[in-house]
Amino acid sequence: MDSKDQTMFYNFGDDSIEEDVKKLMKQVYVALEEKGYNPVNQIVGYLLSGDPAYIPRHKDARSMIRRLERDEIIEELVKAYLKNNEIGEK
């Protein structure tokens, strides 16, 4: 079987980033709102593209969001969504 046909596993192994992501997202969200942007649209734009221009420099939000890897942020967002919708592990 070709190795491209097999499911690969992805594991960070570090659950300590959950609080870091939560704090970061709150701060970035507030900065985006204060500047009059739609926070969800701007954060999604950044996470999909990796372009920090989606996040303003206001309140140091741009440098804060770049402290964490985008895949770490996405992982925590997916985990929170699944937990809030009672999907998966309980």
Swiss-Prot record:
Short name of one Pfam family: IreB
Superkingdom, taxonomy of origin: Bacteria
InterPro entries linked: IreB (IPR009309)
Record-stated family: Belongs to the UPF0297 family.
Name this protein carries in UniProt: UPF0297 protein lmo1503
Species in which this protein is naturally found: Listeria monocytogenes serovar 1/2a (strain ATCC BAA-679 / EGD-e)
Lineage: Bacteria, Bacillati, Bacillota, Bacilli, Bacillales
